[in-house]
A protein has these predicted regions:
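Transmembrane alpha-helical segments that form core, pore/gating elements
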Residues: 42-44, 78-135
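Hydrophobic transmembrane alpha-helices of multi-pass small-molecule transport proteins
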Residues: 12, 45, 57-76, 93-94, ...
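Structural signature of hydrophobic alpha-helical transmembrane segments
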Residues: 21-38, 82-95, 137-151, 197-198, ...
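Helix-helix packing/entry segments at the starts of transmembrane helices
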Residues: 31-37, 104-122, 152-187
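C-terminal transmembrane-helix exit sites in multi-pass transporters
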Residues: 19, 38-60, 179-199
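Specific transmembrane alpha-helical segments of multi-pass solute transporters/efflux pumps
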Residues: 1-30, 35, 43, 70-71, ...
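Membrane-interface helix-cap regions at the ends of transmembrane helices
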Residues: 1, 17, 66-81, 121-141, ...
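Hydrophobic/small/kink-forming positions within alpha-helical transmembrane segments
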Residues: 9, 13-17, 39-44, 70, ...
Length: 219
């Protein structure tokens, strides 16, 4: 698998506990809005790892998205359900996924799928000694199983997709989660993210959407 393969395993494996820590310490809206910045980090990693140039359009996008993330971070100080610690965990997941997607591009001559169980099983084994994984399992078994199935399918597709499209394009598709997740959590769990999170998140999503629509219209 090589050093890059093991690095991929570490990046992907570490995102699961970091994601849980993010959701536990800040609002779901903050988490997914920060995730929306993944194309930006993917572009940066593609530049440093693959040598792909960063256009003026992307540089402007990076500037505006960074400002949007600052607005979200500020909102965490004004909202009881948000916290900057959770925002940092979400940012780590975002950066790790972007780096992992770029590594898939670099290793596109081989299938990275066999590395996924290594990554997640390794993460699960380590976490087993620090948690109580079977607490409440009987009561919530159906939720555990649904979560496992959805995560497994989504992760496999994420591992396959960047072999055929660029990592920024793959990251862009994840923006659908950014739009749907806060609305579902707000509707079902009544978790209002706060005006700062909504404003900063809207800035991030709209900037990325306009930036990429501009590219698609030129093709």
């Amino acid at each position: 698998m090589g050093k890059l393969g093991w690095l991929y395993c570490f990046l992907i494996g570490s995102t699961s506990p970091a994601f849980v820590c993010a959701v536990e310490n800040t609002s779901v809206a903050n988490v997914v809005f920060i995730f929306a910045a993944m194309p930006i980090f993917a572009s940066l990693f593609s530049y440093f790892i693959l040598g792909e140039p960063i256009s003026k359009r992307v540089k402007k996008t990076i500037f505006i998205v960074t400002f949007g993330l600052i607005v979200i971070a500020y909102g965490s100080t004004e909202n009881e359900i948000s916290n900057w610690k959770g925002d940092l965990f979400a940012l780590y997941v975002c950066v790790s996924y972007a780096a992992a997607l770029t590594l898939i591009r670099k290793l596109k001559s081989i299938s990275i799928l066999p590395a996924l169980p290594v990554a997640y099983l390794g993460s699960a084994i380590i976490l087993f000694f620090f948690t109580e994984p079977f607490t409440g399992f009987e009561r919530n078994a159906h939720l555990y199983l649904m979560h496992g199935v959805f995560i497994a399918i989504g992760t496999c597709f994420l591992a396959i997709g960047p072999r055929y499209i660029t990592s920024p394009e793959a990251s862009l598709l994840i923006l659908l989660e950014t739009i749907l997740a806060p609305l579902l959590v707000w509707a079902v769990l009544y978790e209002y993210p706060g005006i700062w999170s909504i404003g900063g998140g809207a800035m991030v999503v709209l900037t990325l959407s306009i930036s990429n629509l501009y590219v698609f219209n030129k093709v």
